């Protein structure tokens, strides 16, 4: 699972050799520090892994951390919030992610026929 928060980007997986914990990885240490602090664990450096930083956390702790991250959403624009917490260089990378994901929009996403529109908003 890829997760973007106002403090960074992490990738969480459950390895077959350690099914009792989630291995949560990141490209930069700062992205993992809030989770490591909440879980009471140390960030492990693994320079030869696909992600250079990781923590091992119990599933319930990761779920609680995710819920806490969601409960802190008080902004109307994610990228602007990240510019405040991580700076503009990091935000530039988020724009690249946003642009890449724009390419995955399905063909009906910009449908203008009112009969085909959802009743919900945003």
Regions found by a protein language model. Give the residues of each.
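Structured alpha/beta or helical-core interaction and ligand-binding surfaces enriched in interleaved
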Residues: 1-122
């Amino acid at each position: 699972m890829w997760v973007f928060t106002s403090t960074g980007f992490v990738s969480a997986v459950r390895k077959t050799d350690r099914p009792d914990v989630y291995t949560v990885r990141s490209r930069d240490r700062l992205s993992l520090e809030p989770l490591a602090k909440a879980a009471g664990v140390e960030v492990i450096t693994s320079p030869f892994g696909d992600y250079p930083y990781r923590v091992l956390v119990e599933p319930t702790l990761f779920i609680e951390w995710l819920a806490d991250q969601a409960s802190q959403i008080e902004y109307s624009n994610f990228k602007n919030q990240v510019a405040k917490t991580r700076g503009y260089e990091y935000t530039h990378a988020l724009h690249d992610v946003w642009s890449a994901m724009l390419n995955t929009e399905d063909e009906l996403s910009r449908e203008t026929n009112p009969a085909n529109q959802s009743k919900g908003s945003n």
